Amino acid sequence: MKILNFASLNIDMVYDVEHIVSPGETILSLNMEIFAGGKGLNQSIALARAGGNVFHAGLIGDDGEMLKNILAENNVNLEYLKTANGKTGHAIIQVDKSGENCILLFSGANHQISTDFAHEVLKDFSKDDILVLQNEISNLPYIVKTAAKKGMKIILNPSPFNEVMEDIDLNDIYCLILNEIEAECISGGSIDGFENWAKNNYPDLKIMLTLGKKGAKFISRDLTAEHPIFPVKTVDTTAAGDTFTGYFVVGISENKPIEDILKYAAAASALAVSKKGAAPSIPEFKAVEEFLKQN
C-alpha cells in the first residue's frame, strides 16, 4: 500500500519571543532560526519516520532546494515534487516562552497546483492507496473528488479551516483528523455536540479528534477510543499535530489496533513538543519505542 501526501512545503522562519506580539505592538525577538516546514512536509517526514511508504506531491519555487533535500534524506519519494515559477511557500512563526506559537503563512508555490498537475499525480495511484491531504494547497476539492472516484482512502486534515471546505463532500473522506476548533467550524456547532453531528450526518466517516492537553479521541461507527497526552516539558508545539497525523496514518495503513495507533501517535507527539523546530523535532520510530518503554 502506498501513501501519497499531496501537500504543502514551506520555509519556516521561527522567532523566539517573550510573548506573542499584539496588534500595533513592536517587540524584539530573542532569537531567529530557519527550518524546513509546512504541514505537508512535516507530515511526510512523520509518515516516513513512522515507517510508511510515502510519496510527496507538491510544488516548490527555485528557492526550495533545502526542502527537497530534507525529504530525500528522510526517504520520501520525490517523483511528484516539482518546481514552479515564483517563491516557495513560507511561514513566519512566533514561539513564546511557554512553547505556544502564532503562524503567518505565505502560500507561494503551494497555491500553484493546477488540476492538470493533480491529474498527472493521481493517475499513478489506485484503490485503497492512502491519500493524505491538508488545506494548504490549491484545487483541494478537485483532488478529493478525483481520488474518491479512484477508491483511494482519503485522510483529510482540514487545516487551516476556510471556505474551501464548503466544496468538500465529506462522504468522499475516509477519515478526518481535526482539533476542537476545526470540529466546531466543520459542524457549525459546539464541540459538545460534534460527535452526534458526525454520527448522524456521516455515519461511515472516521474521526480522529485531537484535544490538546486532554489527549485524543477516535470516533467511528463501531468504536470509540481515547488516549491521554504524555506529560513532557513543552518547548515548541509547531509540529505536534503533524507528527500525530503521520504516526496515526501509518498505523491505519498497517491495520494496527486503534489503541496501539493512538498510543504511538501520542508518544511521537510528546517527543515532538519537547524539541525546537518543526521537521527537526519529529521523532524516529525507534525513539518512540524507547519513550514508550520508559513511560
List the predicted regions and their residue ranges.
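Positively charged, low-complexity intrinsically disordered leader regions
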Residues: 1-23
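Substrate-binding N-lobe of the ribokinase-like
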Residues: 2-3, 23-90, 286, 290-294
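Short beta-strand scaffold segments in enzyme catalytic cores
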Residues: 45, 90-94, 102, 215-219
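Gly/Ala-rich phosphate-binding loop of Rossmann-like dinucleotide-binding domains
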Residues: 48, 148, 253
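Conserved phosphate-binding/catalytic loop of the ribokinase/pfkB sugar-kinase fold
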Residues: 56, 81-83, 93-130
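Conserved phosphate/ATP/ADP-binding segment of small-molecule kinases
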Residues: 148-226
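Conserved post-catalytic alpha-helical subdomain immediately downstream of the catalytic base
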Residues: 205, 228-295
